[in-house]
């Protein structure tokens, strides 16, 4: 007889017994059925035990696939290397930052970051074409591809970061807007300029900030707007306005070349925050990374004490694991390859232009005419805002 029929026959037998003896409580019989059923089920389990699943050794996880790349990824570096030079949009009218020196060569703090980028790509700071652009020309020049990168005392703002087809990569100089006046005016605050005329350059955050500040303080004034920096400061020097406004660094550099610098004072007022830095065209993340990490390499160089004079020795005998990675001395790690550059790209940058501190001192330090105190542009360890993300 099939074992599967046993529970059924037992149930039938119990039901028949219950019908023939109605005085017997049915609850007892139900209990017996449950007990029998349980016994049968246990028997079945014992007779047909479940087989344990075979143990399988964990497989080695497959490497993660590379992140998908946007259509424009790598196009700028290909274009620059095929051309054999970098086209850098710069200012030609701000001493200390971007100007043409007495020998006819471009020089300045911003210009040196163009050179740093050329060193990272070509290991040659001379492979650059400088393209001077005004405040109004700079964004169209970047959008159209006329220039590869814009490094021209440009303030990082939300609108510029979203509406102009470009991305800011890092802040190279922390500044703030100021106001310069003739000492003879005896002005000490913005309110002293009420009903006056103020020279300002068109197409700049300076023009917008001036309007914001004077409106907030309810000061009536007349703006005298000019197309470029030279025209703006020429008008001030000629006495066509009572004051001139731009970034404080620009005021300091411009005052240094006036006929009588000491006859002019910069008011003790800061009208805005002005983080200045390079800008690249949107759509090429590799190029964005190259420019960004070139800036950080100069800052890290100063943090680690790597200079133009000792970079070769430091690369041969790096003192820390991070310095080893930065200078391409780690046999297992090639950070340059992540950027599409050579393994020693950061060595080439520091060898070509120096670390951030060297760049600053050469163009804006105490031995220069401009002589701008570092202030916020000091390393974080020295009370400033500058530090590099980790090189790892």
Sequence positions of predicted segments:
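Intrinsically disordered, low-complexity Ser/Thr/Pro-rich tracts
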Residues: 1-75, 79
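Extended ligand-binding regions for polar small-molecule ligands
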Residues: 66-71, 115, 119, 184-187, ...
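Extracytoplasmic small-molecule ligand-binding "clamshell" domains
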Residues: 69-150, 341, 356, 379, ...
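Short, hydrophobic alpha-helical packing/hinge segments within bilobed ligand-binding/sensory domains
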Residues: 76, 113-114, 137-142, 229-235, ...
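Sec-exported extracytoplasmic/periplasmic mature domains
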Residues: 81-85, 118-126, 143-147, 155, ...
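Bilobed "Venus flytrap"/periplasmic-binding protein-like clamshell domains
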Residues: 87-96, 106-121, 155, 175-233
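Acidic, polar ligand-binding/catalytic clefts
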Residues: 115, 119, 123-192, 249-270, ...
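C-terminal functional modules
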Residues: 332-392
